[in-house]
Swiss-Prot record:
Residues in Cyclin N-terminal domain copies: 46-162
Protein name in UniProt: Cyclin-C
Chain segments carrying region Disordered: 278-298
Pfam families in UniProt: Cyclin_N
Cell location: Nucleus
Function: Component of the Mediator complex, a coactivator involved in regulated gene transcription of nearly all RNA polymerase II-dependent genes. Mediator functions as a bridge to convey information from gene-specific regulatory proteins to the basal RNA polymerase II transcription machinery. Mediator is recruited to promoters by direct interactions with regulatory proteins and serves as a scaffold for the assembly of a functional preinitiation complex with RNA polymerase II and the general transcription factors.
Native organism: Caenorhabditis briggsae
């Protein structure tokens, strides 16, 4: 997995340091502070997850539950798009729905109704956050045009390496290490897997996916997950033998904890309305694909 990752477009084009990330967001930083943008990161991930869940329950897609990997891929697409574009360039609600639609294709998920994503975007926002979704058109063509634009901005880099697989591989390695060194099996290993998987999913609400390799995020999620269970000391002997950059690991862990601290203090129902009130209106309507093709040279 590690070898495949380091040769991938993910590793070569979509890993940045913190300074680069905030520099690329310069246009939106004229509107939002870093803390406000970090709160928006939490909101956008929650919004995309909510739209995916709502679509799974819609009549058009009954019984079609989106896998977590589809949701995770959509969130990554969304974050990457807004490294190269600002909120003023294209409606983020439309980009979020488009990212989900594209992720379903890339992750080879069952084809979903295009109209459902538009419809459920309009349902989810007022129901959960009290925010209205305004679009000039509800026609399917709007979504297809925005899909073309999204692919263009992403440089057709659509394969995303997630932290879930390396996290499970690392957990298995730790389990075997513990059994070999202590002759005692790990207690409640299934609960540990569940907790660490939850942390991995939560990392989508901050920027670690734009900064660190999947194995680093997976290892950080294990460390945080075990600490949250009050069992962090059980990892100490094993961590000494893990071949990784400990400074990057510590940075990743710190960012996850910072995200959790911010999330706990984030009153979404009230604060999202204020954040959305500051959201810039797109400069122009979404141009047709051929016009976009001549405008972007990425």
């Amino acid at each position: 997995m590690a070898l495949d990752f380091w040769k991938s477009s993910h590793a070569q084009q979509w890993i940045f340091d913190k300074t680069e990330i905030w520099k690329q967001r310069a246009e939106d930083m004229k509107t939002y502070s870093e803390e406000e943008y970090s709160r928006l990161n939490i909101f956008w991930a929650n919004f995309i997850t909510a739209v995916a869940t709502e679509c799974a329950h819609s009549q058009a897609n009954v019984g079609c539950k989106l896998r977590q990997q589809v949701i995770a891929t959509a969130i990554v697409y969304f974050k990457r798009f807004y490294l190269r574009q600002s909120f003023r360039d294209m409606c983020p609600f439309l980009v979020a729905s488009t990212a989900l639609f594209l992720a379903c294709k890339v992750e080879e998920h069952t084809t979903l109704s295009v109209s459902s994503f538009l419809k459920n975007t309009a349902l989810v926002l007022p129901k959960r956050w009290g925010v209205a979704f305004e679009t000039n058109s509800a026609k399917n063509g709007v979504l297809y045009d925005s899909e073309f634009i999204l692919v263009e901005i992403l440089d057709c880099c659509l394969v995303v390496h997630h932290a879930t697989r390396p996290m499970f591989e690392l957990l298995e390695d730790w389990k075997q290490h513990t059994l070999t060194s202590t002759n005692t099996p790990v207690k409640d290993f299934d609960q540990i897997e569940i907790q660490c998987q939850k942390v991995v999913n939560d990392t989508l609400r901050c920027d670690v996916g734009l900064m660190f390799a999947p194995h680093c995020i997976g290892l950080a999620s294990i460390s945080v997950g075990m600490e949250l269970m009050g069992r962090g000391e059980e990892l100490e002997d094993w961590l000494v033998e893990v071949d990784t950059d400990m400074d990057k690991l510590a940075d990743c862990i710190n960012q996850i904890y910072t995200m959790y601290q911010l999330w706990r203090s984030f009153d979404e129902k009230e604060e999202v309305k204020k954040l959305m009130a500051k959201l810039p209106k797109p400069n122009t309507p979404i141009p047709p694909p051929q016009q976009q093709q001549s405008s972007y040279h990425m």
